[in-house]
């Protein structure tokens, strides 16, 4: 079981997010330079603890008594939903100021390593808070169900969204973005932190203002640097991971590589190392051939290409440092970067690259819900055997025990990865339909008959097309829909641009790409 990457590279895969593939470490234990007991509660006065005797001690992830974030903040609309939690808009009761509250379900923090990682992320955000281009951290609160992180509200949206919305795009604009990203790297390294997961999705705009700052918002894989230590655990996101990470011998230079990948995308619209599978991406990274021949590279300045080459140098000892990048003639403030517009096709490719095709994921779930019982009799029995408390859902502990009974020797991290891959709605457990979707052979799920049934499910009026209204209704039924997502899906799937999806387009979507994904069994 698992996939061939685990055999060749010793790593496990996370579910795809926002059109990119991610890798998760085998061993997530990381070093800290800070006492967990010094984690801020976010208040200047002694907090009104609720039953501290009951809620203190080892049970608390933050190693402090529980504290209700709602005593200090009013939580309102949902801003976003990720693999590990939900982000809400929140308002501080004492000042009326607006912040973002990231709520991480404790069901997702099942291993000792998960809890250590959570504490470390908070420590690092506290350590870096107040620096330019880094989100300001307000405080951490823990209750019975979740750990809540309150931080600066970045109301300007995602980095790529802003670039795409502008229309006009130039080397100077790309240099401005890259300068802020590398400034984050420079600050992190100066303050003894290695980020380890730089990618566009981890940067937001501070406001909708034209001159808004770019802010780094996610430090979940970051570590305090131990001088002289060689890091070996494989972390990061597939397109952005440095070759030395795959070789399991790396240091802080990996952050410059990731920033160089982002710069390549900013200038061309696509990553330099591309393949349909994670294995293909990693093989391309290790081979290290960078394409400067295809469009738009012939029209990109030599100075820009020089910086990309220096940042994507295979040997980390010869790779340019963050401080040196900031002094490069093309990147520095008022430098050589031209304001001449870059080919508009770059923006189009960038949009396609970042668009996650949520419709395909939803279609597989619909197929699993409606598949004939006789086809899945064995899987049904397997689900019942693993669901030992007959709750109708499989918890992490049940999955771990069930795999052990089948003779599996997976590590805790690998079991956790399988759990996350199967848990589509992110509630910390696997329901029956999620189990079927994750365990059935993909070719059976995607048979012509099943694909047609899924199309009919979305095509409510039987017109032969999935309209915008039908798409919106289907996505919202599963809590996946917003206007931006619908537009991205249509852009990605609607080949003839008539504003609706016909059966041929739907089939092409279901057959395309099919990157290798982890299966439970």
From Swiss-Prot:
Catalytic activity: L-seryl-[protein] + ATP = O-phospho-L-seryl-[protein] + ADP + H(+); L-threonyl-[protein] + ATP = O-phospho-L-threonyl-[protein] + ADP + H(+)
Residues binding Ca(2+) 4, per UniProt: 494, 496, 498, 500, 505
Lipidation (N-myristoyl glycine): 2
Subcellular location: Cell membrane; Nucleus; Cytoplasm
Posttranslational modification: Autophosphorylated.
Keywords in alphabetical order: ATP-binding, Calcium, Cell membrane, Cytoplasm, Kinase, Lipoprotein, Membrane, Metal-binding, Myristate, Nucleotide-binding, Nucleus, Phosphoprotein, Repeat, Serine/threonine-protein kinase, Transferase
Gene Ontology MF: a single term: protein serine/threonine kinase activity
Phosphoserine, modified sites: 237
Residues binding Ca(2+) 1, per UniProt: 387, 389, 391, 393, 398
Membrane topology (UniProt): Lipid-anchor
Biased segments, Basic and acidic residues type: 21-36
Active site, renumbered: 197 (proton acceptor)
Induction: Up-regulated by abscisic acid treatment and drought stress, but not by thiamine.
Residue segments, region Disordered: 15-56
Effect of mutating residue 2 to A: Loss of membrane association
Binding site residues for Ca(2+) 2: 423, 425, 427, 429, 434
Tissues expressed in: Expressed in primary roots, leaves, inflorescences, siliques and guard cells. Expressed in the shoot apical meristem.
UniProt note: phenotype after gene disruption: Increased sensitivity to abscisic acid stomatal closure. Delayed floral transition.
EC number per UniProt: 2.7.11.1
Protein function: Ca(2+)-dependent protein kinase. Negative regulator of stomatal closure and slow anion currents. Unable to phosphorylate THI1 in vitro, but the kinase activity is essential for the stomatal closure regulation. Phosphorylates FD. May play a role in signal transduction pathways that involve calcium as a second messenger.
Identification of the protein by name: Calcium-dependent protein kinase 33
């Amino acid at each position: 079981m698992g996939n061939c990457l685990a055999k060749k590279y010793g790593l496990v895969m996370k579910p795809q997010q926002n059109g990119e593939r991610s890798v998760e470490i085998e061993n997530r234990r990381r070093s800290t330079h800070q006492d967990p007991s010094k984690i801020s509660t976010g208040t200047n006065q002694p907090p009104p603890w609720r039953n501290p005797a009951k809620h203190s001690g080892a049970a608390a992830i933050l190693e402090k008594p529980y504290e209700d974030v709602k005593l200090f903040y009013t939580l309102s609309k949902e801003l976003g939903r990720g693999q590990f939690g939900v982000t809400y808009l929140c308002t501080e009761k004492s000042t009326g100021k607006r912040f973002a509250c990231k709520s991480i379900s404790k069901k997702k923090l099942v291993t000792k390593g998960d809890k250590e990682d959570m504490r470390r992320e908070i420590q690092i955000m506290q350590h870096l808070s107040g620096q330019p281009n880094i989100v300001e951290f307000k405080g951490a609160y823990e209750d019975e169900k979740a750990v809540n992180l309150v931080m600066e509200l970045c109301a300007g949206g995602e980095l790529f969204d802003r670039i795409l919305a502008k229309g006009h795009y130039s080397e100077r604009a790309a240099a401005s973005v890259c300068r802020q990203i590398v400034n984050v790297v420079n600050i992190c390294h100066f303050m003894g932190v290695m980020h380890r997961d730089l990618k566009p999705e981890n940067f937001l705009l501070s406001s909708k203002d034209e001159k808004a700052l770019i802010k780094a918002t996610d430090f979940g894989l970051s570590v305090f640097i131990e001088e002289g230590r060689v890091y070996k655990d494989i972390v990061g996101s597939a397109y952005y991971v440095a070759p030395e990470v795959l070789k399991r011998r790396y240091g802080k230079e990996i952050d410059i590589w990731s920033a160089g990948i982002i710069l390549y995308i900013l200038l061309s619209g696509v990553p330099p190392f591309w393949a349909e599978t994670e294995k293909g991406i990693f093989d391309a990274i290790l081979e290290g051939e960078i394409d400067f021949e295809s469009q738009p590279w012939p029209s990109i300045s030599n100075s820009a290409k020089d910086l990309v080459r220096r940042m994507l140098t295979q040997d980390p000892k010869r790779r340019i440092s963050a401080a040196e990048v900031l002094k490069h003639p093309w990147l520095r403030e008022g430098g050589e970067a031209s304001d001449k517009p870059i080919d508009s096709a770059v923006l189009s490719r960038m949009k396609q690259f970042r668009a996650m095709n949520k419709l395909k994921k939803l279609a597989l779930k619909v197929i699993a819900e409606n598949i004939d019982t006789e086809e899945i009799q064995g899987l049904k029995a397997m689900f019942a055997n693993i669901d030992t408390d007959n709750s109708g859902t499989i918890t992490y502990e049940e999955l771990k025990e069930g795999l052990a009974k089948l003779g599996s020797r997976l590590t805790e991290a690998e079991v956790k990865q399988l759990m996350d891959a199967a848990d589509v709605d992110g509630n910390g457990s696997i329901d029956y339909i999620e189990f079927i979707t994750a365990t059935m052979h993909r070719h059976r799920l995607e048979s012509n008959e099943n694909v047609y049934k899924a199309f009919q499910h979305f095509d409510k009026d039987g017109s032969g097309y999935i309209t915008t209204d039908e798409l919106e209704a289907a996505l919202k039924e599963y809590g996946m829909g917003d206007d931006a997502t619908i537009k991205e899906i249509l852009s990605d799937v609607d080949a003839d641009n008539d504003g609706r999806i016909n059966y041929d387009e739907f089939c092409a979507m279901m057959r395309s790409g099919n990157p290798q994904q982890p299966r439970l069994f």
